[in-house]
């Protein structure tokens, strides 16, 4: 299978027919059209384009690809098709997500370490939240309704500039599995620059969404969520603006849904 730009999976099947026209369809055992698979026949070119939506359920599903010749005396060809169950996952998305359509347009960040005299850690970690209107941070977490992206890029150690500001460097940041802590308890733990730890599930209610997550809120409650497990974030500082950036996202959640946009 290959991934299409519409988020579907595609398989091309070659058909060699002699002295007959033919058609194709994807059905269940009772002959009803499937809602998750579609067969498109290109009889002149001799192939079937079988497209699937991604299975987000924990059960496999099956159907039949029916190829029907028009010539008399020829039987239809019935090919079983099966789609495996989705792997164990945390995402609630059932397809790709275009982040550009959500209205993410402002945010806030904190920097660690932020004390100029804290020189033990050779990298800087930026705790970034990008939000839509209607979502606001509070002492208890997030209030309102809307969308949020939370992620923590790591850079080489950043010092305050002449304008008393810290500037996030331009470049591409890769989503990675968190580094293990050193066995030596006296060793200093720090992450690699130009990385962002992937999203994982925390062990407490107040810290359930750790590191890189897309979250949807309704009336202060999370109603949709997706951990980002791979991909890249490209950062570009906006010229002429004191503290504004463009973020380009090319991400995957834990069942392969794409989260993309700028």
Language-model segments: residues:
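Surface-exposed binding patches on compact interaction domains or structured appendages
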Residues: 10-49
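Beta-sheet-dominated interaction scaffolds and their linkers
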Residues: 1-13
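Short, exposed coil/turn segments at beta-strand boundaries within extracellular/luminal domains
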Residues: 69-78, 257-259
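Surface-exposed helix/loop patches within compact recognition domains
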Residues: 112-235
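Interdomain boundary/hinge segments at the C-termini of tandem beta-sandwich modules
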Residues: 80-87
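Extracellular/surface recognition and adhesion modules
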Residues: 13-15, 37, 65, 81, ...
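Short, surface-exposed loop/turn segments at beta-strand-coil junctions that are enriched for proline
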Residues: 53-59
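A short beta-strand micro-motif common to beta-rich folds, especially ectodomain repeats
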Residues: 59-71
């Amino acid at each position: 299978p290959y991934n299409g730009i519409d988020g579907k999976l595609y398989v091309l099947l070659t058909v060699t027919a002699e002295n007959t026209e033919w058609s194709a369809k994807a059905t269940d055992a009772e002959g009803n059209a499937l809602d998750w698979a579609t067969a498109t026949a290109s009889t002149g070119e001799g192939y079937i384009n079988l497209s699937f939506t991604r299975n987000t359920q924990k059960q496999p599903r099956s159907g039949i690809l029916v190829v029907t010749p028009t010539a008399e005396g020829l039987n239809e060809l019935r090919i079983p098709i099966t789609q495996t169950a989705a792997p164990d996952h945390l995402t609630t998305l059932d397809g790709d997500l275009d982040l550009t359509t959500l209205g993410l347009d402002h945010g806030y960040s904190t920097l660690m370490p932020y004390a100029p005299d804290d020189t033990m850690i050779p990298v800087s970690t930026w705790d970034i939240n990008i939000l839509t209107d209607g979502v606001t941070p509070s002492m208890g977490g997030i209030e309102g309704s809307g969308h949020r992206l939370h992620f923590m890029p790591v850079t080489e150690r950043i010092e305050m500039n002449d304008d008393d500001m810290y500037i996030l460097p331009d470049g591409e940041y890769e989503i990675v599995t968190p580094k293990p802590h050193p066995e030596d308890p006296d060793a200093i733990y720090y992450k690699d620059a130009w990385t962002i730890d992937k999203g994982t599930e925390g062990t407490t209610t107040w810290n359930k969404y750790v590191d890189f997550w897309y979250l949807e809120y309704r009336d202060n409650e999370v109603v949709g969520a997706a951990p980002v497990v791979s991909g890249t974030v490209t950062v570009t500082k906006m010229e002429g603006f004191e503290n504004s950036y463009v973020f380009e996202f090319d991400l995957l959640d834990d069942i392969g849904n794409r989260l993309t946009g700028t």
